[in-house]
Amino acid sequence: MASLCLSSSRIVSLHHQKPFLSLKLRSRPSDLSGLGRHTSPVCFNPLRLSGDRQRTATVSTRVEKRRKRGSSVVCYAAPISANSLQWISTISCLALMLARGTGIHKSVVVPLFALHAPSSIVAWIKGEYGVWAAFLALIARLFFTFPGELELPFIALLLVIVAPYQVMNIRGKQEGAIIAIAISGFLAFQHFSRAGSLEKAYEKGSVLATVAIIGVTVVSLLLLL
Protein backbone atom coordinates (compact mmCIF):
# COMPACT_ATOMS: atom_id res chain seq x y z
CA MET A 1 0.00 0.00 0.00
CA ALA A 2 2.89 2.31 0.68
CA SER A 3 4.19 1.88 -2.81
CA LEU A 4 0.83 2.66 -4.11
CA CYS A 5 0.70 5.81 -2.02
CA LEU A 6 4.10 6.88 -3.21
CA SER A 7 3.16 6.24 -6.75
CA SER A 8 -0.04 8.10 -6.34
CA SER A 9 1.73 11.07 -4.77
CA ARG A 10 4.20 11.17 -7.60
CA ILE A 11 1.36 11.02 -10.04
CA VAL A 12 -0.39 13.85 -8.22
CA SER A 13 2.79 15.92 -8.12
CA LEU A 14 3.40 15.31 -11.77
CA HIS A 15 -0.19 16.16 -12.45
CA HIS A 16 0.20 19.42 -10.59
CA GLN A 17 3.48 20.28 -12.31
CA LYS A 18 2.27 19.75 -15.85
CA PRO A 19 -0.18 22.65 -15.87
CA PHE A 20 2.49 24.93 -14.40
CA LEU A 21 4.94 23.92 -17.09
CA SER A 22 2.32 24.20 -19.75
CA LEU A 23 1.42 27.70 -18.58
CA LYS A 24 5.03 28.81 -18.82
CA LEU A 25 5.37 27.33 -22.24
CA ARG A 26 2.16 28.98 -23.42
CA SER A 27 3.01 32.37 -22.00
CA ARG A 28 6.12 32.76 -24.15
CA PRO A 29 4.33 32.56 -27.48
CA SER A 30 1.76 35.05 -26.18
CA ASP A 31 4.55 37.50 -25.32
CA LEU A 32 6.10 37.02 -28.71
CA SER A 33 2.77 37.51 -30.40
CA GLY A 34 2.28 40.76 -28.44
CA LEU A 35 5.64 42.00 -29.53
CA GLY A 36 4.79 41.13 -33.11
CA ARG A 37 1.62 43.18 -32.90
CA HIS A 38 3.13 46.32 -31.43
CA THR A 39 6.49 46.38 -33.25
CA SER A 40 7.21 46.70 -36.95
CA PRO A 41 10.18 45.31 -38.83
CA VAL A 42 13.00 47.83 -39.52
CA CYS A 43 14.27 47.66 -43.12
CA PHE A 44 17.32 49.53 -44.42
CA ASN A 45 16.92 50.94 -47.94
CA PRO A 46 20.10 52.60 -49.33
CA LEU A 47 18.25 54.09 -52.32
CA ARG A 48 15.80 55.89 -50.05
CA LEU A 49 18.67 57.25 -47.95
CA SER A 50 20.46 58.63 -51.01
CA GLY A 51 17.22 60.26 -52.23
CA ASP A 52 16.76 62.00 -48.87
CA ARG A 53 20.32 63.29 -49.02
CA GLN A 54 19.76 64.69 -52.50
CA ARG A 55 16.59 66.48 -51.39
CA THR A 56 18.37 67.98 -48.40
CA ALA A 57 21.24 69.18 -50.60
CA THR A 58 18.77 70.73 -53.09
CA VAL A 59 16.89 72.59 -50.35
CA SER A 60 20.12 73.92 -48.83
CA THR A 61 21.30 75.10 -52.26
CA ARG A 62 18.05 76.99 -52.83
CA VAL A 63 18.27 78.64 -49.43
CA GLU A 64 21.84 79.76 -50.11
CA LYS A 65 20.84 81.20 -53.49
CA ARG A 66 18.00 83.16 -51.91
CA ARG A 67 20.33 84.53 -49.25
CA LYS A 68 22.84 85.58 -51.88
CA ARG A 69 20.13 87.27 -53.91
CA GLY A 70 18.85 89.11 -50.87
CA SER A 71 22.28 90.27 -49.73
CA SER A 72 23.62 91.25 -53.15
CA VAL A 73 23.71 94.93 -54.10
CA VAL A 74 21.74 95.74 -57.23
CA CYS A 75 22.93 98.81 -59.09
CA TYR A 76 20.35 100.51 -61.25
CA ALA A 77 20.75 103.89 -62.86
CA ALA A 78 17.39 105.50 -63.40
CA PRO A 79 17.13 107.89 -66.38
CA ILE A 80 16.91 111.62 -65.56
CA SER A 81 13.45 112.99 -66.20
CA ALA A 82 12.76 116.05 -68.33
CA ASN A 83 11.60 117.96 -65.25
CA SER A 84 14.95 117.38 -63.53
CA LEU A 85 16.81 118.57 -66.63
CA GLN A 86 14.68 121.72 -66.71
CA TRP A 87 15.52 122.43 -63.08
CA ILE A 88 19.23 122.01 -63.82
CA SER A 89 18.99 124.41 -66.76
CA THR A 90 17.02 126.96 -64.70
CA ILE A 91 19.61 126.96 -61.91
CA SER A 92 22.39 127.28 -64.50
CA CYS A 93 20.64 130.24 -66.14
CA LEU A 94 20.25 132.01 -62.80
CA ALA A 95 23.94 131.36 -62.06
CA LEU A 96 24.87 132.90 -65.42
CA MET A 97 22.74 135.95 -64.69
CA LEU A 98 24.50 136.53 -61.37
CA ALA A 99 28.03 135.45 -62.39
CA ARG A 100 30.70 138.06 -63.05
CA GLY A 101 33.69 136.19 -64.45
CA THR A 102 32.36 135.89 -68.00
CA GLY A 103 32.22 138.04 -71.12
CA ILE A 104 28.95 136.77 -72.57
CA HIS A 105 25.88 138.88 -73.38
CA LYS A 106 23.79 138.01 -70.36
CA SER A 107 20.59 139.31 -71.93
CA VAL A 108 20.64 136.22 -74.20
CA VAL A 109 20.18 134.05 -71.11
CA VAL A 110 16.68 135.46 -70.50
CA PRO A 111 14.90 133.69 -73.42
CA LEU A 112 16.80 130.51 -72.54
CA PHE A 113 15.37 130.74 -69.03
CA ALA A 114 11.86 131.14 -70.45
CA LEU A 115 12.30 128.07 -72.67
CA HIS A 116 13.74 125.76 -70.02
CA ALA A 117 11.88 126.86 -66.88
CA PRO A 118 9.79 124.03 -65.35
CA SER A 119 6.02 124.18 -65.68
CA SER A 120 5.62 124.78 -61.94
CA ILE A 121 7.77 127.93 -62.09
CA VAL A 122 5.96 129.20 -65.19
CA ALA A 123 2.59 128.61 -63.52
CA TRP A 124 3.76 130.46 -60.39
CA ILE A 125 5.06 133.42 -62.43
CA LYS A 126 1.84 133.68 -64.45
CA GLY A 127 -0.26 133.32 -61.31
CA GLU A 128 -1.25 135.90 -58.74
CA TYR A 129 1.98 135.72 -56.74
CA GLY A 130 4.13 136.17 -59.83
CA VAL A 131 2.14 139.19 -60.99
CA TRP A 132 2.39 140.81 -57.57
CA ALA A 133 6.14 140.11 -57.46
CA ALA A 134 6.60 141.73 -60.88
CA PHE A 135 4.46 144.71 -59.86
CA LEU A 136 6.43 145.34 -56.67
CA ALA A 137 9.74 144.91 -58.50
CA LEU A 138 8.63 147.41 -61.15
CA ILE A 139 7.60 149.96 -58.50
CA ALA A 140 10.97 149.53 -56.77
CA ARG A 141 12.76 149.90 -60.11
CA LEU A 142 11.11 153.27 -60.69
CA PHE A 143 12.56 154.73 -57.51
CA PHE A 144 15.78 152.78 -57.10
CA THR A 145 18.58 151.64 -59.35
CA PHE A 146 19.15 147.92 -59.59
CA PRO A 147 22.54 146.41 -60.36
CA GLY A 148 22.87 144.73 -63.72
CA GLU A 149 22.84 141.25 -62.20
CA LEU A 150 19.47 141.87 -60.48
CA GLU A 151 17.81 143.42 -63.52
CA LEU A 152 18.06 140.24 -65.56
CA PRO A 153 15.87 138.10 -63.22
CA PHE A 154 13.31 140.91 -63.20
CA ILE A 155 13.32 141.04 -67.02
CA ALA A 156 12.95 137.26 -67.17
CA LEU A 157 9.96 137.52 -64.82
CA LEU A 158 8.29 140.11 -67.05
CA LEU A 159 9.08 138.13 -70.21
CA VAL A 160 7.34 135.01 -68.92
CA ILE A 161 4.30 137.05 -67.81
CA VAL A 162 3.79 138.95 -71.09
CA ALA A 163 4.83 136.13 -73.47
CA PRO A 164 1.93 135.07 -75.73
CA TYR A 165 0.56 131.57 -75.76
CA GLN A 166 2.07 130.73 -79.16
CA VAL A 167 5.57 131.50 -77.90
CA MET A 168 5.22 129.59 -74.64
CA ASN A 169 3.66 126.66 -76.49
CA ILE A 170 6.99 125.73 -78.12
CA ARG A 171 8.35 124.82 -74.69
CA GLY A 172 9.08 121.11 -74.51
CA LYS A 173 8.87 120.67 -78.28
CA GLN A 174 11.53 120.16 -80.93
CA GLU A 175 11.39 123.78 -82.06
CA GLY A 176 12.05 125.04 -78.56
CA ALA A 177 14.89 122.54 -78.09
CA ILE A 178 16.57 123.69 -81.33
CA ILE A 179 16.34 127.35 -80.28
CA ALA A 180 17.76 126.47 -76.85
CA ILE A 181 20.70 124.61 -78.43
CA ALA A 182 21.43 127.59 -80.68
CA ILE A 183 21.40 129.98 -77.71
CA SER A 184 23.52 127.74 -75.47
CA GLY A 185 26.02 127.12 -78.30
CA PHE A 186 26.34 130.87 -78.86
CA LEU A 187 26.91 131.45 -75.14
CA ALA A 188 29.53 128.69 -74.96
CA PHE A 189 31.37 130.12 -77.98
CA GLN A 190 31.40 133.60 -76.48
CA HIS A 191 32.53 132.43 -73.08
CA PHE A 192 35.41 130.17 -74.15
CA SER A 193 36.61 132.49 -76.92
CA ARG A 194 36.76 135.51 -74.62
CA ALA A 195 38.31 133.50 -71.81
CA GLY A 196 41.36 132.87 -74.03
CA SER A 197 41.95 129.22 -73.09
CA LEU A 198 40.42 126.34 -71.19
CA GLU A 199 42.74 126.90 -68.24
CA LYS A 200 41.56 130.49 -67.85
CA ALA A 201 37.94 129.38 -68.19
CA TYR A 202 38.38 127.22 -65.09
CA GLU A 203 40.04 129.86 -62.96
CA LYS A 204 38.58 130.99 -59.67
CA GLY A 205 36.59 133.90 -61.09
CA SER A 206 35.24 132.06 -64.16
CA VAL A 207 34.63 128.52 -62.97
CA LEU A 208 31.00 129.21 -61.94
CA ALA A 209 30.10 130.62 -65.36
CA THR A 210 31.94 127.77 -67.11
CA VAL A 211 30.08 125.08 -65.18
CA ALA A 212 26.75 126.86 -65.76
CA ILE A 213 27.33 127.13 -69.52
CA ILE A 214 28.32 123.46 -69.75
CA GLY A 215 25.19 122.52 -67.81
CA VAL A 216 22.92 124.58 -70.07
CA THR A 217 24.49 123.14 -73.23
CA VAL A 218 24.31 119.52 -72.07
CA VAL A 219 20.70 119.91 -70.92
CA SER A 220 19.72 121.45 -74.26
CA LEU A 221 21.24 118.49 -76.10
CA LEU A 222 19.53 115.95 -73.83
CA LEU A 223 16.13 117.60 -74.21
CA LEU A 224 16.45 117.40 -77.99
CA LEU A 225 17.10 113.63 -77.92
Curated annotation (Swiss-Prot):
UniProt keyword terms in alphabetical order: Chloroplast, Membrane, Plastid, Plastid inner membrane, Transit peptide, Transmembrane, Transmembrane helix
Membrane topology reported for the UniProt record: Multi-pass membrane protein
Residue intervals annotated with topology Chloroplast intermembrane: 99-102, 150-151, 197-204
Membrane listed as a keyword: yes
BP terms from Gene Ontology: cellular response to cold; cellular response to water deprivation; cold acclimation; response to abscisic acid
This protein's GO CC annotations: chloroplast; chloroplast envelope; chloroplast inner membrane; chloroplast thylakoid membrane
Induction: Accumulates in response to abscisic acid (ABA), cold, freezing and drought treatments.
Parts of the chain that traverse the membrane: 78-98, 103-123, 129-149, 152-172, 176-196, 205-225
This protein's name: Cold-regulated 413 inner membrane protein 1, chloroplastic
Organism: Arabidopsis thaliana (Mouse-ear cress)
